[in-house]
Amino acid sequence: MMEVPREIIEKLEIFQKLVKKWNKSINLVSDNTIHNFWQRHILDSLQLIQYIDNKEIHLVDIGSGAGLPGIVLSIAGVAQVSLIEADLRKCIFLEKASKISNNNVQIINQRIEKVEIDCSILTCRAFSNLNTIFNCIKNISVREKFLLLKGKNYLTEIVEAKERWLFGYLIHQSITCEEGKILEVSNLTKMI
C-alpha cells in the first residue's frame, strides 16, 4: 500500500467532500461509485504518483471532469498541473477544487483538439480509447510520457492504436482494481 502524508490525506478528504457536494448537480462521477469514493477515485488517481519521478514538472490532464487524476496529483505534490475540460460547469467545479492544492493549477475550458501546450506528462482517466486520445492531442507536446488509467479492454486498445501509431509502452497493474491497468506510453509518433 502507498504511504501518504497526513496533510495530503486531509486535503484529499476535503476534495472528496467537494466532489460529493457538486456531484448532486453536475454528475462528476457515477452515483454507483460514491459509496466507495476513496478506493475507486482517490486511490485510483493517487497511484499514478509512483510513476512520476520528478514532481517539479508540468502535467496535463485531459478530459479532467471531476479532477481525477489531475487535482489529486496536484494535491500530492506535482508542481504544475493543467486541466483541460470542455464542459464549463465542470471547469467551475475544477476552479473551486484547485484551491485545495498548494501547487499551480490551470483550468483550460476548451476542447482538447484546440489546446496547444507543452508538458512532461499527460494523464487521463475514463476519457476514451487510445486512438481517440492520440488523435485529440495533436497540438499537445508530451516530452516524457503518458500515464493512462485503463480498464479491461486495454489490450484491444493497444492493438488498434498500433495500426496507426508507433509508441513504446509498459503495463502496470492497478492497485485498486484487478481489471484496471496503468498504461505508461512513450515516444508516440503517427505512422505515415
UniProtKB/Swiss-Prot annotation:
<keyword id="KW-0489">Methyltransferase</keyword>
<feature type="binding site">
    <location>
        <position position="63"/>
    </location>
    <ligand>
        <name>S-adenosyl-L-methionine</name>
    </ligand>
</feature>
<dbReference type="InterPro" id="IPR029063">
    <property type="entry name" value="SAM-dependent_MTases_sf"/>
</dbReference>
<protein>
    <recommendedName>
        <fullName>Ribosomal RNA small subunit methyltransferase G</fullName>
        <ecNumber>2.1.1.170</ecNumber>
    </recommendedName>
</protein>
<keyword id="KW-0808">Transferase</keyword>
<dbReference type="Pfam" id="PF02527">
    <property type="entry name" value="GidB"/>
</dbReference>
<feature type="binding site">
    <location>
        <position position="125"/>
    </location>
    <ligand>
        <name>S-adenosyl-L-methionine</name>
    </ligand>
</feature>
<keyword id="KW-0698">rRNA processing</keyword>
<feature type="binding site">
    <location>
        <position position="68"/>
    </location>
    <ligand>
        <name>S-adenosyl-L-methionine</name>
    </ligand>
</feature>
<dbReference type="InterPro" id="IPR003682">
    <property type="entry name" value="rRNA_ssu_MeTfrase_G"/>
</dbReference>
<dbReference type="GO" id="GO:0070043">
    <property type="term" value="F:rRNA (guanine-N7-)-methyltransferase activity"/>
</dbReference>
<keyword id="KW-0949">S-adenosyl-L-methionine</keyword>
<feature type="binding site">
    <location>
        <begin position="112"/>
        <end position="113"/>
    </location>
    <ligand>
        <name>S-adenosyl-L-methionine</name>
    </ligand>
</feature>
<comment type="function">
    <text>Specifically methylates the N7 position of guanine in position 527 of 16S rRNA.</text>
</comment>
<comment type="similarity">
    <text>Belongs to the methyltransferase superfamily. RNA methyltransferase RsmG family.</text>
</comment>
<keyword id="KW-0963">Cytoplasm</keyword>
<dbReference type="GO" id="GO:0005829">
    <property type="term" value="C:cytosol"/>
</dbReference>
